[in-house]
Amino acid sequence: HAQSVAGCYGDRNVKTPALDDLAKRGVRFDNAYCASPICVPSRMSMLTAQHPSKQRCWTNDDHLASDAPTWLHALGAAGLYPELIGRMHAMGPDQMHGYAHREVGDHSPNWGGVPRHDMGVLNGTNDPQGHSLVACGAGQSAYELKDCDVTAATIEALDRIARECRPFCLTVGLMLPHAP
């Protein structure tokens, strides 16, 4: 969620009571920044707290070494149960990197040589001309449908966690907004 439109960050125009309450009771990342403009290096930097040059992921085709320590490993060692729902875009055979459970995976395979599913009119969304957006027109995209699955799984997980009444770490990876 954009910091500029959240009550917990001082916006007085929008009403975000659920986010405000979560921020009051949880951890808020006030000084976070993106370590790379590219998806995989940025996400792996977030997991390791290391710049791309240190964790050795420079492109979307690079993968984080399975033995690279992440803050999720530390949470697991402290007795928490880190969960991931949805997109993380971890390339390579290790899709967990310290997460103990993953309910919904990425939108497509993240390992070279594995065929990706057909995205229909979304194929080529990253093209600078945005041809797929023109072809797609109004309506639901495959990314929106994926996000619906992720959102439903997240609601179920939060309900379960509330019943268990325990500290938790839940990472939710949505597709949208995304390219272009």
Tell where the protein language model's regions lie, with residue ranges.
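Formylglycine-dependent sulfatase
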Residues: H1-P180
